[in-house]
Amino acid sequence: MKTKIIVIVGPTAVGKTALAIEVAKCFNGEVVSGDSQQVYRGLDIGTAKASPEEQAAVPHHLIDVREITESYSAFDFVSEAKMTIEDIHSRGKLAIIAGGTGLYIQSLLEGYHLGGETPHEEILAYRASLEPYSDEELAHLVEQAGLEIPQFNRRRAMRALEIAHFGQDLENQEILYEPLIICLDDERSQLYERINHRVDLMFEAGLLDEAKWLFDHSPNVQAAKGIGYKELFPYFRGEQTFEEARESLKQATRRFAKRQLTWFRNRMQVTFYQIGESGVQDRILSQIEEFLDD
């Protein structure tokens, strides 16, 4: 019997953390971060980690588990998330995965992990190369590769082609979970306004100092490549004004949100909720209750 879990995804600044905490309180749950940047100690503001008060109210996992000089991959996430979910479930509690790193969450849910020597950037690039193909063209590629896909759909076709292309670097494993995947969204202009406002709040909270600390200590590590930090490095090098760097960060974050939505819409079977609609949280909680009782 597969373990039921709740998965909360969506673009940055849409309110995933707040919803995850509310779900955890209502259903005796614990939150597992599905964010590739929140694993790093010392990077708190730019990664929008749950506050110390929020983490005290509800247990959070896979936050602050790496130093900024250490790497972190989808393989690491899947391995650690599986152990964490098993521990949460063994204590009779509900695991709630919340985050915006689509590759990590999809890898966990679809029963394979990324191992071997292939960087996940190469896998992302390969996936992106398949996007322009129509369903008919994908079916032809699947046939050419000698693959058989029961109940053909686009997602299964792309996954099968990835496995065939990368060989042992994509290892099939048993699918362990029965997820309810909730994707939060907002009207585009409202979402962009939320993003701009959150960036302003981050600067008020000390983002510039946090980014400067990273720039001074480890500007070339993986942790420094995340949105929220690298956009400020030109300012530290004297190549941009502060206002130019701040606007660059806002623009990069808006573009990132758009890519996140595209990923969740095209690659995962989600239930969308518009956060601006009246009573949306009550409807989400009702759906979760029905899912858990089923």
Curated annotation (Swiss-Prot):
Pfam families: IPPT (PF01715). SUPFAM superfamilies: P-loop containing nucleoside triphosphate hydrolases. It catalyses: adenosine(37) in tRNA + dimethylallyl diphosphate = N(6)-dimethylallyladenosine(37) in tRNA + diphosphate. One of its GO terms (molecular function) is tRNA dimethylallyltransferase activity. Its EC number is 2.5.1.75. Its cofactor is Mg(2+). GO terms for biological process: tRNA modification. Substrate binds at residues 12-17. It comes from the Bacteria. The record marks 101, 127 as: Interaction with substrate tRNA. ATP binds at residues 10-17. Residues 35-38 are annotated as: Interaction with substrate tRNA. InterPro entries: Dimethylallyltransferase, IPT, P-loop_NTPase. Gene3D superfamilies: P-loop containing nucleotide triphosphate hydrolases. Keywords: ATP-binding, Magnesium, Nucleotide-binding, Transferase, tRNA processing. Monomer. Belongs to the IPP transferase family. Catalyzes the transfer of a dimethylallyl group onto the adenine at position 37 in tRNAs that read codons beginning with uridine, leading to the formation of N6-(dimethylallyl)adenosine (i(6)A). This is tRNA dimethylallyltransferase. It comes from Streptococcus pneumoniae (strain P1031). The gene is miaA.
